[in-house]
Amino acid sequence: MRKTSKWLFALIIMIQLTPVSAALDTARQAELLYLLKHDCGSCHGMTRKGGLGPPLLPENLRDRPPMFMENTVLDGRPGTPMPPWRGLLTEQEVRWLVEAIRRGEGL
């Protein structure tokens, strides 16, 4: 039983570490990068250096947990211009988008 628990724990960790991008096809990834540049860029700046919204550059996001960013994208920020994207994007797509933003992809 103990051996099974260790194996199961290792499997769960491996699943958690599997990149999200493996599940999204390249066409959808390209669409998300377009959305990032044009939709997110309309408030956060086309080069993501800020504007109506805060900067979305990797160096500005180091201290932000990915889960915080995912929740912000999904649910918006009440009292701010940040709209919710839940219903338009899946959680998996938002996770991929947050990873791309944190890597500086599309800059």
Regions found by a protein language model. Name each.
Residues 18-23:
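Sec/Tat signal peptide C-region and signal peptidase I cleavage site
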Residues 8-16:
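Bacterial N-terminal signal peptides
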Residues 58-106:
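Extracytoplasmic electron-transfer domains, predominantly the class I c-type cytochrome c fold
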Residues 49, 106-107:
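Charged, solvent-exposed alpha-helical segments that act as regulatory interaction surfaces
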Residues 1-8:
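Bacterial N-terminal signal peptides that target proteins for export
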Residues 26-47, 68-75:
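Sequence/structural segment immediately N-terminal to covalent heme-attachment motifs in c-type
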Residues 52-56:
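Short cysteine/histidine-rich zinc-coordinating motifs and their immediately flanking basic loops
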Residues 47-50, 79:
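Alpha/beta-hydrolase active-site loop signature
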